[in-house]
From Swiss-Prot:
The RNAP catalytic core consists of 2 alpha, 1 beta, 1 beta' and 1 omega subunit. When a sigma factor is associated with the core the holoenzyme is formed, which can initiate transcription. Residues 1155-1183, 1207-1226 have a biased composition (Acidic residues). GO terms for biological process: DNA-templated transcription. DNA-dependent RNA polymerase catalyzes the transcription of DNA into RNA using the four ribonucleoside triphosphates as substrates. SUPFAM superfamilies: beta and beta-prime subunits of DNA dependent RNA-polymerase. Gene3D superfamilies: 2.40.50.100, 2.40.50.150, 3.90.1100.10, DNA-directed RNA polymerase, beta subunit, external 1 domain, DNA-directed RNA polymerase, subunit 2, domain 6, RNA polymerase alpha subunit dimerisation domain, RNA polymerase Rpb2, domain 2. It catalyses: RNA(n) + a ribonucleoside 5'-triphosphate = RNA(n+1) + diphosphate. Its EC number is 2.7.7.6. Belongs to the RNA polymerase beta chain family. GO terms for molecular function: DNA binding; DNA-directed RNA polymerase activity; ribonucleoside binding. This is DNA-directed RNA polymerase subunit beta. InterPro entries: DNA-dir_RNA_pol_bsu_ext_1_sf, DNA-dir_RNA_pol_bsu_external_1, DNA-dir_RNA_pol_su2, DNA-dir_RNAP_su2_dom, DNA-dir_RNAP_su2_hyb_sf, RNA_pol_bsu_bac, RNA_pol_bsu_CS, RNA_pol_bsu_protrusion.
Length: 1250
């Protein structure tokens, strides 16, 4: 029977049949717990690892005693505003002991600022919120695997993998010889390694590992006789080319495997080794050959010939028996040797581990033991923030240790202090690098609260020490049985990362070793009752148990209602009697992740569509007016609460005041607390973060209540979209390919309107020619352009701006050229005012507009931290209200996505019998083949819920069924089939068939048409091919590719094609002439030779092929260089020049730049290049500086004509003359830059000169 449940301030009718036994854990505890562990234990552990540091003589000793974290300099909000890192100073107490004099110096040393985690599990690095994603890696330990040889024989392999250190790999061959590879070198017989470890004779080896034909065959291959020989043999492999000596070899082996600094298994590696190699796991199912006796007390544990079950195996193991001969079911006899269970604190391997691994391999040949599945979650562990940070910190400390040792030997022993020894740079750099550029440190996805939450719960197999996309095969990516309750089988990205990035399941948690655990209810085997005792199991432990599903019916006393219970055991689904069941699931949603658990009727959707649904919910933009779904799953409240976007009451109390910007609560202990609300700030993704109070003055609040909604929340529940009236029908072909038809009402009433905030910044820097200045006094700009700027030259808040408008006025000093006599006179008369400055103002980018909502100014005078060379920084925030429009992408929660094709006036939309027009029309063809029937269930239940005026919850795998929905429809007096007659809005006639209609939750996704639409007339061109760049970011053109050319060829549209491939693309001269012809209203001239064709010729010539281009009559066509063509076109266009510098004249069109107004190098009035007499000019340093300046700033060089302002008075010079004979290549560079500079100048105007 459906029951009413409270979800925050709202009640929902829940169709759940299963009672919640366990409350869901905090959804971001994974991040917080890991970081807390790092601060508590992780840091301490590392300082202990490197302490004490001794110099090479052993006289000076440096010890790290303890550490403390200070208070952060700025609050979280201030850090975001000032673009600094939220961090606290780390101080370490260090003791320096001089053993000769016995002198002890203690000092507190500052070890850099350490980034702190915010309460929501993020870090603020340089003002941006970032998340450290947890990594799934292969756990350290030993892994056994098998392969079938082409001859049909089974070969076994064993690999011992440490967390850091040398790998040890064992393998067998066709002749049953066991080999070992030490640290990826050439293989040796495994007995050589055993000898080197101190088992000198053959007999000792056989006694240690157990006698078998495999070991005897390996001994036959082994040429060594003694421990020394074996050591030398290994040394030859590891250090080829060095003279071998037994002592050196022993030392090498010692450091390679038994030195804690060089070899580290971690606790988890030791735990896994002990677990895999222990007797109790290996002897179950065999029988004893001799009597088994307790090694210490002499007590008989088992007689000969007794079958060993689980209990007896544990008893033998706990007694400390390390080796046992057992009989297999097929009669074979095997000696099983364990590793002697070294203490969990031993982080290196021990001799007995290697013996036990070789013994395990021998047992595998006989059929005892099991090979490992590398993709099983028992063999993969999670490295969370704390551990990732610890590994990075360790690298920094190791580098620091090296520096300290060097300084100890160099500095004077008597006056030395700890502070002088320690160089914190490597540590600070390692931490900075980790947070700034590690693959696992991600810019937080803040599109909506769900995106934030999912980002923090993500598990990635990529990253340092993990897999790479290219190498990862299908097996790693597949859903595995051990994922049940640990990783979501649904939520993973589509594309190259599929299966490599997953999401933590709802109830999962991570244990001390980094393995994912999931909770189960224990079943009492005696009474057969399902208890409320909760046990967390790792994937390994789960494999031993038979587990019933959460929806298995129970009697009121907690026993199973059916005599056969459907259960899981490893990868099988079994029907077993209740007495055999060990555990039961706690909840049906423990299988899936948060995002997937938010999809109602998930059980009715095809998995691949559910995957799209859970991924697309994370892309929903927060809307202006939020609305929780009529049909939810009951997870909405919890996910909004844990995401941290809402304001939560910290204690019980009464609301004194609630305004738009703050809520004031008086607690019961009479304390008054002010909660500041976030107002219209920009998220990482440019969406709008805004909080609004949902309590009123006088309301009573309890601890943990939501008192203010954040973005995409409604009354404390997650609200990513809106409930709209949907019909599944065709509409004049506008549904083609999943397109969506919407009612104009949705635009008019701002149903799907969202606010987007863009940030633009402008820096005033120091340049070589003087400081840049932020000012209202901008050259060559009319007063109408400056109308919205204040006296400083910064736009006023509230101004409406369009593309190209000035946001911040800024001028940059121009390079001074040699002045002519006239200019000197003017300068003398008018003073400095005529000094040249360039307009480098910050303007609104192409295609953007909006209203200025905030301006922030940072200057050095105010003590703001600015990057070097920056004197002032201005940030302008621009907001846009984006109504829903054609081309926007929308989706439901079931993977049903589409693009809006048409917006229909309200009066033309189909309407219901009561006159209500439909809001959205979806294509009915999107349902059958996609198999996401959940949307149909949702639309029926939504209609009933809306009519009855209630909200309902249908939890995943435990929600409403067809019968429930039918009952709800009848209760609401709606047709039980959920269909109704619709009338055509244009004719008023009813449609032929009834149509499925109802309320459905629709999302507006982040792929907005305003961000994607783009157009260009002229713009930047590529340097080599001279073709327009591509893409919106580069302000590029539309690519006309090979296949498009075929299309025009097929039509025979020769002229269109010719002009697309020449004057509209890379015929440089043709472009200029065509532009001029259009401006003058003349006929467009014949196209010339495209630049890319010249590039092709040049490439062929570079292969030493003499390529000529001939015309129809066989005459050679001369292909001019780009620069010569430019000179020619300037002459053709009659551009007047003055001493190599262009005369100021208005450009024909503001945007197209100065394509026709090229800087002319020559003009008819001047001698041609050949006639210029050669002058050898020795360059003085100042001149060289100017050449360098011209090279650094190509645009400026181009603007002043070729000479770059270097020529004397009116004398134009040849480039080559500027350099001595040895400098031809430099001269070429200037030429190259000259060509480029002119192009840049055309394309960008002066804007891009920085």
């Amino acid at each position: 029977m459906p029951k009413i449940v409270q979800a925050g301030r709202r009640q929902r009718l829940s169709f759940s049949r299963i009672d919640e036994v366990l409350e869901m854990p905090n959804l971001i505890e994974l991040q917080r717990n890991s970081y807390q562990w790092f601060l508590r234990e992780g840091l301490q552990e590392m300082f202990q690892d490197i302490s004490p540091i001794q110099d090479f003589t052993g006289n000076l000793v440096l010890e790290f005693i303890d550490y403390s974290l200070g208070e952060p300099k700025y609050s979280i909000e201030e850090c975001k505003e000032r673009d600094v890192t939220y961090a606290a100073p780390l101080r370490v107490r260090v003791r320096l002991i001089n053993k000769e004099t016995g002198e002890v110096k203690e000092q507190e040393v500052f070890m850099g600022d350490f980034p702190l985690m915010t309460p929501t599990g993020t870090f603020i690095i340089n003002g941006a919120e970032r998340v450290i994603v947890s990594q799934l890696v292969r756990s350290p330990g030993v892994y056994f695997s098998e392969q079938i040889d082409p001859s049909g024989k089974k070969l076994f392999f064993a690999t011992m993998i440490p967390n850091r250190g040398a790998w040890l790999e064992f393998e067998s061959d066709v002749n049953d010889v066991i080999y070992v590879r030490v640290d990826r070198t050439r293989k040796l017989p495994a007995t050589v390694l055993l000898r080197a470890l101190g088992f000198g004779s053959d007999q000792e080896i056989l006694d240690a590992v157990g006698d078998s034909e495999y070991i005897r065959r390996t001994l036959e291959k082994d040429s060594t006789e003694s421990e020394e020989e074996a050591l030398i043999e290994i040394y030859k492999r590891l250090r080829p080319g060095e003279p071998p000596a037994a002592d050196n070899a022993r030392q090498l082996l010692e450091t390679l495997f038994f030195e804690p600094k060089r070899y580290d298994l971690m606790h988890v590696g030791r735990y896994r080794l002990n677990k895999k190699l222990a007797l109790k796991r290996r002897i179950v199912g065999t029988s004893t050959v001799d009597r088994v006796v307790h090694p210490e007390t002499g007590e008989v544990l088992a007689e000969a010939g007794v079958q060993i079950d689980k209990r007896l195996a544990e008893k033998i193991d706990e007694a400390g028996v390390d080796a046992l001969t057992v009989r297999l079911r097929d009669g074979g006899i095997v000696r099983v040797v364990a590793n002697g269970r070294p203490d969990i604190r031993v982080k290196t391997i021990v001799r007995q581990d290697i013996v036990a691994v070789i013994n395990y391999m021998v047992s595998l040949f006989k059929g005892l033991g099991s090979v490992d599945d590398i993709d099983h979650l028992g063999n993969r562990r999670v490295r969370s923030v704390g551990e990732l940070l610890q590994n990075q910190f360790r690298i920094g400390l190791a580098r620091m240790e090296r520096v300290i040792k060097e300084r100890m030997t160099i500095q004077d022993v008597d006056i030395i202090t700890p502070q002088a020894l320690i160089n914190i740079r490597p540590v600070v750099a390692a931490v900075k690098e980790f947070f700034g550029s590690s693959q696992l440190s991600q810019f937080m996805d803040q599109t909506n609260p769900l995106a934030e939450l999912t980002n923090k719960r993500r598990l990635s197999a990529l990253g340092p020490g993990g897999l790479s996309r290219e190498r990862a095969g299908y097996e790693v990516r597949d859903v595995h049985t051990s994922h049940y309750g640990r990783m979501c089988p649904i939520e993973t990205p589509e594309g190259p990362n599929i299966g490599l990035i997953g999401a933590l399941a709802t109830f999962a948690r991570i244990n001390e070793y980094g393995f994912i655990e999931t909770p189960y209810r224990k079943v009492d085997q005696e009474s057969g009752r399902v208890t409320d005792e909760i046990v967390y199991l790792t994937a390994d432990e789960e494999d031993e148990n038979i587990i019933a599903q959460a929806n298995e019916p129970l009697n009121p006393d907690g026993t199973f209602a059916r005599d056969r219970v459907t259960c899981r055991y490893r990868d099988e689904i079994l029907q077993v009697p209740p007495s055999q069941v060990d555990y039961m699931d706690v909840s049906p949603k423990q299988v899936v992740s948060i995002a997937t658990a938010l999809i109602p009727f998930l059980e009715n959707d095809d998995a691949s569509r559910a995957l799209m649904g859970s991924n697309m919910q994370r892309q929903a933009v927060p809307l202006l007016r939020t609305e929780a779904p009529y049909v939810g799953t009951g997870m909405e409240y919890r996910s909004a609460w844990d995401s941290g976007v809402c304001v939560i009451a910290e204690n019980d109390g009464v609301v004194l005041r609630a305004t738009a910007s703050e809520v004031v609560v008086q607690y019961d202990d009479m304390q008054v607390k002010k909660y500041k609300l976030t107002k219209f700030t920009r998220s990482n993704q440019g969406t709008c973060m805004n909080q609004k109070p949902i309590v009123r003055a006088g309301d009573r609040v309890r601890k943990g209540d939501v008192i203010a909604d954040g973005p995409s929340t409604d009354q404390g529940e997650l609200a990513l979209g809106r409930n709209v009236l949907v019909a599944y029908m065709c509409y004049e072909g506008y549904n083609y390919e999943d397109a969506i038809i919407i009612n104009e009402r949705l635009v008019r009433e701002d149903v799907f309107t969202s606010i987007h905030i863009e940030e633009h910044e402008c820096e005033a820097r120091d340049t070589k020619l003087g400081p840049e200045e932020i000012t209202r006094d901008i050259p060559n700009v009319g007063e109408d352009v400056l109308k919205d700027l204040d006296e400083r030259g910064i736009i006023r808040i509230g101004a409406e701006v369009r593309p190209g408008d000035i946001l911040v006025g800024k001028v940059t000093p121009k390079g001074e050229t040699e002045l002519t006599a006239e200019e000197r006179l003017l300068r003398a008369i008018f003073g400095e005012k005529a000094r040249e400055v360039r307009d480098t103002s910050l303007r609104v980018p192409h295609g953007e507009s909006g209203i200025v909502v905030d301006v922030k100014v940072f200057t050095r005078e105010n003590g703001d931290e600015l990057s070097p060379g920056v004197n002032e920084l201005v940030r302008v925030y621009m907001a846009q209200k984006r109504k829903i429009s054609q081309g926007d992408k929308m989706a439901g929660r079931h993977g049903n996505k589409g693009v809006i094709s048409v917006i229909v006036p309200e009066e033309d939309m189909p309407f219901m019998p009561d006159g209500t027009p439909i809001d959205i029309i979806l294509t009915p063809l999107g349902v059958p083949s996609r198999m996401n029937i959940g949307q149909i269930m949702e639309i029926h239940l939504g209609w009933a819920a809306k009519t009855l005026g209630m909200y309902v919850a249908s939890p995943v795998f435990d929600g409403a069924n067809e019968q429930d929905i039918r009952e709800m429809l009848l209760k609401a007096h709606l047709p039980p089939n959920g269909k109704t007659v619709l009338y055509d809005g244009k004719t008023g006639e009813p449609f032929d068939n009834e149509v499925t209609v109802g309320y459905k939750y629709m999302l507006k996704l982040h792929h907005l048409v305003d961000d994607k639409i783009h157009a260009r007339s002229t713009g930047p061109y590529s340097l080599v091919t001279q073709q327009p760049l591509g893409g919106k970011a580069q302000f590029g053109g539309q690519r006309f590719g090979e296949m498009e050319v075929w299309a025009l060829e097929a039509y025979g549209a020769a002229y269109t094609l010719q002009e697309l491939l020449t004057v509209k693309s890379d015929d440089v001269v043709g472009r200029v002439k065509t532009y001029e012809a259009i401006v003058k209203g003349e006929n467009v001239p014949e196209p010339g030779v495209p630049e890319s064709f010249k590039v092709l010729i040049k490439e062929l010539q570079s292969l030493a092929l003499d390529v000529k281009v001939l015309d129809e009559s066989g005459n050679e066509i001369e292909l001019r260089e780009l620069d010569d063509e430019m000179d020619l076109s300037d002459r053709d266009l009659e551009i007047p020049t003055l001493g190599g510098a262009e005369l100021a004249k208005p450009a024909p069109d503001a945007q197209a730049g100065e394509e026709s107004g090229e800087a002319g190098e020559e003009s008819e009035g001047e001698p041609e290049e050949e006639d210029v007499e050669e002058i050898d000019v020795p360059l003085d340093p100042e001149e060289l500086e100017k050449v360098a300046g011209a090279l650094k700033n190509p645009v400026r060089a181009g603007r002043r004509g070729a000479g770059g302002g270097l020529a004397d008075d009116d004398q134009e010079m040849d480039e080559e003359d500027l350099f001595d004979e040895g400098d031809e290549d430099l001269a070429d560079d200037v030429g190259l830059y000259r060509g480029r500079s002119r192009r840049l100048a055309d394309d960008f105007g002066d804007e891009e000169e920085e």
